[in-house]
């Protein structure tokens, strides 16, 4: 079966990529090198992960070793929400590009639909704890990002954490030059996202699933939170296929033609997470996994939930 999705630009995006959120700078370099050695060609990055410099070092070392060519890699990064002012977009992008030590990106995403006040704080708040928004919106940021495509610095643009109303606003923007090719969203058995995935795919927008394993290592996890990796029925499906739970959770997305970016810094797991193209989940398996949906999010940025353009109040 295909190991990539074809984007609306005709570029091929590998279905499984390495996620780097929560990978500490000390570990992420070795993780990226192990991933490239294991056959990964898609690396998902972001300014806000504070580790793009090390990711870039790993990519450069592998290119120098002739382990991989730049044109065979698919490198993604994201514009953080404090850089929506047009004058700031290019600076933020150049920071990312120089940290990654590349001369172009394959895909550049708007990381979050709300614009936050520019400055050093990633989530700026007033003294009452209220999140401070920017006067600039994702539509302003998009115009500046389109210039990066026109200049040959980025091959394609996308979005992340957008609901379908926000996507409609972008698609209907007067003078839109470059359509979003992908929407990167949280998805796993407790957040199956069927309606949003169907909507995106119907518009020619590929979907990438982040936190496919339920983000068990998120720093703010509460003891009562559900644990995706511990669902007995999914353990049963994994045993039946002689696969790990993680492999089943990754395969679940691959079979929906959804790109998936599991994060790991452990070489054996990094390898294992790519070994999902040699088995098939049955219709019953897929239906069983989908049945666990409860619209539970590991990543909800609740601090911003009372502000305009918060994406998760809508059904999809």
Swiss-Prot record:
Positions of disulphide bridges:
none
CDD domains reported for this sequence: AKR_AKR1B1-19
Which tissues show it? Expressed exclusively in the epithelial cells of the deferent duct.
Active site residues of this protein: 49
Give the main EC class: oxidoreductase
- First-listed, main subcellular location of the protein, grouped into a coarse class: cytoplasm
Assembly and binders: Monomer.
Name of the protein in question: Aldo-keto reductase family 1 member B7
Q: Which organism is it from?
A: Mus musculus (Mouse)
According to the entry, what is the taxonomic lineage of the organism?
A: Eukaryota, Metazoa, Chordata, Craniata, Vertebrata
Q: State the encoding gene.
A: Akr1b7
């Amino acid at each position: 079966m295909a190991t990539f999705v074809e984007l609306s630009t005709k570029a091929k995006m590998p279905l499984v990529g390495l996620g780097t959120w929560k990978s500490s700078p000390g570990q992420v370099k070795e993780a990226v090198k192990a991933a490239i050695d294991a056959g990964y060609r898609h690396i998902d990055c972001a300014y806000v992960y504070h580790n793009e410099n090390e990711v870039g070092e790993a990519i450069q070392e592998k290119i120098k070793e002739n382990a991989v060519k730049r044109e065979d890699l698919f490198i993604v990064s994201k514009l953080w929400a404090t850089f929506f002012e047009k004058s700031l977009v290019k600076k933020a992008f150049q920071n990312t590009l120089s940290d990654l030590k590349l001369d172009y990106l394959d895909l550049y995403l708007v990381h979050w639909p709300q614009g936050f006040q520019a400055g050093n704080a990633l989530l700026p708040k007033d003294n009452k704890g209220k999140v401070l928004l920017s006067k600039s919106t994702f539509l302003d940021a998009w115009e500046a990002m389109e210039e990066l495509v026109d200049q040959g610095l980025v091959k394609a643009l996308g979005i992340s954490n957008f609901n379908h109303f926000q996507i409609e606003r972008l698609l209907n923007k007067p003078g839109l030059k470059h359509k979003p090719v992908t929407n990167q969203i949280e998805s796993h058995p407790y957040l199956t996202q069927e309606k949003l995935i169907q909507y995106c795919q119907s518009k020619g927008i590929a979907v990438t699933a982040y936190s496919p394993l339920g983000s068990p290592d998120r720093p703010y996890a509460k003891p009562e939170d559900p644990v995706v990796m511990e669902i007995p029925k999914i353990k049963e499906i994994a045993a039946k296929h002689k696969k790990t739970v993680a492999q089943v959770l990754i395969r679940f997305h691959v079979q929906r033609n959804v790109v998936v970016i599991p994060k790991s810094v452990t070489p054996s797991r990094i390898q294992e997470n790519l070994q999902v193209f040699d088995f098939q989940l049955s219709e019953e398996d897929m239906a069983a996994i989908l049945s666990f949906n409860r619209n539970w999010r590991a990543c909800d940025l609740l601090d911003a939930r009372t502000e305009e353009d918060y994406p998760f109040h809508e059904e999809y």
